[in-house]
Amino acid sequence: MVIRITPIAYYRNIGISAHIDAGKTTTTERILFYTGVNHKIGEVHTGSATMDWMEQEQERGITITSAATTCFWSGMAKQFPVHRINIIDTPGHVDFTIEVERSMRVLDGVVMVYCGVGGVQPQSETVWRQANKYKVPRIAFVNKMDRMGANYLHVVEELKTKLFANPVPIQLAIGSENKFTGVVDLIKMKAINWNDSDQGVTFFYEDIPNDLIELSNFWRNHLVESAVEESEELLDKYLSNSTQLTEYDIKQALRKRVLKNEILLVTCGSAFKNKGVQSMLDAVVEYLPSPTDLVSVKGILKKDGCALEERYVKDSEPFSALAFKVATDPFVGNLTFFRVYSGVVNSGDSIFNSVKEKRERFGRIVQMHANKREEIKSVYAGDIAAAIGLKDVSTGDTLCDCNHPIILESMEFPDPVISVMVEAKTKLDQEKMGLALSRLSQEDPSFRVWIDQDSGQTIIAGMGELHLEILVERMRREFSIEANVGKPQVAYRETIRSVIKQEGKFIRQSGGRGQFGHVWLLLEPMNINNESSSDSYKFFNKIVGGVIPKEYIPAVDKGIQEQISNGVLAGYPIVGVSVTIFDGSYHEVDSSEIAFKIAGSIAFKEGFMRANPVLLEPIMKVEIETPEEYMGDVIADLNRRRGIISNLENSMNIGRIIHAKVPLSEMFGYATALRSQTQGRASHSMEFLKYNEVPNNIAQSIIESRRVK
């Protein structure tokens, strides 16, 4: 019989996400303190944060990997049954956006942390889009209200104008900067103050300060009006007599609207000063979904099929789970993190990887707390845990009951935009490096490794300079491999702009049996998804009447795909091309798979060069915050870098914010240049935006330099 300690309705699977430096990890550390997981508060600036357990995280003061933990909460006033909160603390730097992506896929709700000074910053927008993609309900916590320049209502306005959210504050800040003392609860219409003597463990209610009564009434009305929009019945009740609305009515209506992603409830505080995190935890329990709010999860029966399959979020259903992360642990080997959607699984059980169509066996199952492990015997619907001993599981694979297969929706991974050459310093390290890179790429789907066919060098590619720097550093620390690293290279792509028909023939007679392959291909440009290359090539078979036997068609496709990987114009991967094989011929004796593979390759290569081929380059979305006096110099420098200024706005911190689109090739070393231009007073962030055509004169020099190599 299944014994579940916490009812599934009392589960909350949440993420903590934000822009870098919004105080996200500090917020998580306070959560661990107030829920009793930690008896001492960890701090990012001292390198003692529980969730930032990697050495690089402690040294740099940033989150690099998504860390998982579990805590329990029964409310500030112990007003709830005990709720189990599974938390994933995700990175804020755009180079590690894959960690956010895979966490969003398996979470039920998210707490978006915003800086009370910086407001909605670039990575905040990226995380918001990722949450939208997976339709994850969320609440907001405006942090750092004790900081100079903090402005709560300005951040609320930015949530509306920058994210197009529908923010509904359920709290107001009492004071700001060094006068920030607590919050106004707009539902109870009381002031909440936390006791400094016990680091905010206890609190007390007070009357709202006189200077905030008018503002509180205004935002209280806004909150109630947002709540009653949930149903006509509630609206009628409100219009007939607004005093009839109970606290329960308001909270239930707000919760329903949060679950439908119609509103964003906003709370505030200062995690560092131990104020506001406690009431934000109450909001997690009251407004974010439990796994049962999902009701059921849908998937398909087979990889190539479209027959839908459904699992209800119950322990009694067949087991189904999604592997969302694979990590290497120095003590136990591979750790596979997974989210259980239905059923129960025990350590020692056999399960089925429905994506790879392989049976696996759960060795040990562990509950993770950052990098610490607690062994458990069973996991239930709604749980997030890690398995030790799974041999061939990748991020995005479905794990399920052997007798009841299902394939759940996976996740998309961005293609790398930057690459470098790596070379081990010793021959012994060279042999170990292959294994190390293989393990690192298994952990991180946005990290790629390959051998350059011409030079024989090992190339690694990722989402940015910091991303690759961290991975090379991990090779040194975790695998004891010292490596030389080349200069960063841009991940260019090749594509076509015209439609073309092209013949390809491969005929060879050398006495005895010869070789014969003959195809006609139609090459067409197609729109590409800039985030992933998974849909950047399509192959269609329009052969009729048996002019080419069907067993040779896959060989033609294979020949084309090899050319696509190696490039035609300058040796870069090809994207955005649709190929149709529509005619050709064969020889009953001399035709073979290899002959048609070569014929397909020849036709594609020659057709590509006739179809107006172009080079594409990654364009970065760049945001620069600079004092007003340096703005002219910064903009002039961006123009020299082929940048396009898309917007200028006033900064909540200093001066102005410049929004620009700049080719990645022009941004290497930009941090140093910006520091010298502005005497170290400006800051910038950038993330991949899209691929654009390289101007002809620059493309020609790139092509020539590749030919010389």
Swiss-Prot record:
Pfam families: EFG_C (PF00679), EFG_III (PF14492), EFG_IV (PF03764), GTP_EFTU (PF00009), GTP_EFTU_D2 (PF03144). GO terms for cellular component: cytoplasm. GO terms for molecular function: GTP binding; GTPase activity; guanosine tetraphosphate binding; translation elongation factor activity. Keywords: Cytoplasm, Elongation factor, GTP-binding, Nucleotide-binding, Protein biosynthesis. It comes from the Bacteria. GTP binds at residues 18-25, 89-93, 143-146. This is Elongation factor G.
